[in-house]
Each structure stands twice: as structure tokens, then as C-alpha cells.
Design a protein with these regions (language model features):
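Short coil/turn linker and secondary-structure boundary residues
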Residues: 31, 137, 160-163
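Charged C-terminal helix
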Residues: 151-178
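Alpha/beta enzyme core
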Residues: 1-103, 110-132, 168
């Protein structure tokens, strides 16, 4: 990135420590809701806020101008062992209103993806499965994993009588405990 490199006295290849410290000073700052106005002022690109898992935060994201919300626990890196993100999705979608909600966290199969779409997610991210495929089989392995996830989603929809994603979304999810 030429803009980032212009902040450095030496190229990162020559002084990696300085590059790391500059990166941390530039991008490692704590962000607050008040920063959204600045973000909106410096770009015409859509702003998607990731890590929104509470309906109050979803409403605040919409109020501050987020173009989309990414309901995610960041792959469990930030805090592991909390409430499953899928259990939070419906409330986030409801609070977001017409603002699109994307989802990831624990998506390991086509079934997981279809459930998230039925709960209102507009799109579903898949993290670990394709990286496992990549590690084991390179690009072909990653492609195989993604094809398998899509095939499972298609099969689940077909056997349950939903020919399209619109049908899945219209049906929603009913959860029974007990």
C-alpha cells in the first residue's frame, strides 16, 4: 500500500518493527460510535460493521449510518465460550430493520448456512471449512469444500420443500426446546 509506505522512514522489508509500530499506532486505536461520522465522511464505499451481536448495538449501528451489519463472534478469537452467535441472530436482524445483516460464526455446513438465511441473514460467511480444504488440497480442496457446502444446502432445501432461498427466508425458523 503506497499510502501506508509513505508513513514509514524505511521500507517494511528493511525495518519490520517500525512498520508494525506504525500499523498499530494508525489502525490499533479503539473505535467508538462517534467515529462513524468520520468514516462516512472519508468514503463513499458501504460501511459494514462486524461483531454486532446485540440488538441494541444493531440499532445503534443503523442509527449511526452503517450500510450493513455483520453478526459475528470473530471466529471465537476475541472471546470463546459465550452465547452461540446463531442464537443472537434473529434479534440482531429484527433490530436492524431493513439494513442487511450478514452472518458467520460456527458455519460448518450447508445446513448451518440455510438456518442462518432462514433466520434473516442476507449472506453467510464460511471461515474454517474452506481453510481446512485449502490446507489439505490447495485451491482444489477449498473449492471442493465450498461445493460440498452448497450441495448440502441445496439438498436440505429440496427435501424440506423449499426450491429457492426466498422460500427459505419466508418460512423462517421455528425452534423447539424440550
Amino acid at each position: 500500500d503506497p499510502v501506508f509506505r509513505s508513513l514509514l522512514a524505511k521500507p517494511p522489508e528493511e525495518d519490520p518493527a517500525a512498520a508494525i509500530f506504525t500499523w498499530a499506532a494508525t489502525f490499533g486505536q479503539v473505535l467508538t460510535w462517534d467515529d462513524m461520522a468520520w468514516f462516512k465522511s472519508v468514503t463513499k464505499l458501504p460501511i459494514v460493521l462486524k461483531g454486532i451481536c446485540h440488538p441494541d448495538d444493531a440499532a445503534r449501528a443503523v442509527d449511526t449510518g452503517a450500510d450493513a451489519i455483520y453478526c459475528s463472534n470473530h471466529g471465537g478469537r476475541q472471546a470463546n465460550g459465550g452465547i452461540a452467535t446463531i442464537d443472537l441472530l434473529a434479534d440482531v436482524v429484527a433490530a436492524a430493520g431493513d439494513t442487511p445483516v450478514l452472518f458467520d460464526s460456527g458455519v460448518r455446513s450447508g445446513t448451518d448456512a440455510v438456518k442462518a438465511l432462514a433466520m434473516g441473514a442476507r449472506a453467510v460467511g464460511v471461515g474454517r471449512p474452506y481453510t481446512y480444504g485449502l490446507a489439505l488440497g490447495g485451491a482444489e480442496g477449498a473449492a471442493w469444500v465450498l461445493r460440498s457446502i452448497l450441495a448440502e444446502a441445496d439438498l436440505l432445501m429440496a427435501v424440506n420443500g423449499y426450491p429457492t432461498l426466498a422460500d427459505v427466508r419466508a418460512a423462517g425458523v421455528q425452534r423447539t426446546i424440550g
